[in-house]
């Protein structure tokens, strides 16, 4: 499968005349097409949700585009939580997965209503110590 670049060499040369290097160019049309294709591929599963790893590309414009296609944000830091909130992603549209994390990060995740994903059983006790309780069954499924 051959993929055609979304800009030509000539277009990049023109952009360089205006913007200093280095810079990033994003293919908005391609991002939208891929997000739409992913959403359609899993449309058979009404409970499916894609969570974009904010750490991969912490760009609010990209997060906003992905939000339009139903994507949530996978966050692992206070800054990523703040960025997600700034673009209007809150509640169960945030998956917070983090290790060796300060209490304030977990508190913000809890305040935003994020799903807190733990991969270490000792974190359950830590959350209890900082007064973050396990959700009720109803909260967990809503």
Where are each of the predicted segments found?
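A charged N-terminal "starter" segment
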Residues: 1-129, 133
């Amino acid at each position: 499968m051959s993929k055609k670049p979304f800009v030509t060499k000539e277009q990049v040369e023109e952009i360089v005349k205006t913007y200093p290097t280095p810079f990033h160019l994003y293919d908005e049309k391609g991002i939208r097409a891929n997000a739409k294709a992913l959403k359609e591929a899993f449309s058979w599963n009404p409970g499916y949700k894609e969570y974009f790893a904010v750490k991969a590309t912490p760009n609010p414009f990209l997060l906003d585009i992905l939000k339009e296609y139903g994507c949530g944000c996978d966050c692992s830091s206070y800054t990523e939580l703040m960025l997600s909130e700034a673009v209007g992603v809150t509640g169960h549209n945030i998956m917070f997965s983090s290790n060796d994390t300060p209490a304030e990060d977990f508190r913000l995740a809890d305040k935003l209503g994020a799903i807190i994903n733990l991969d270490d059983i000792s974190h359950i006790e830590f959350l209890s110590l900082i007064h973050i309780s396990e959700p009720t069954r109803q909260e967990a499924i809503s």
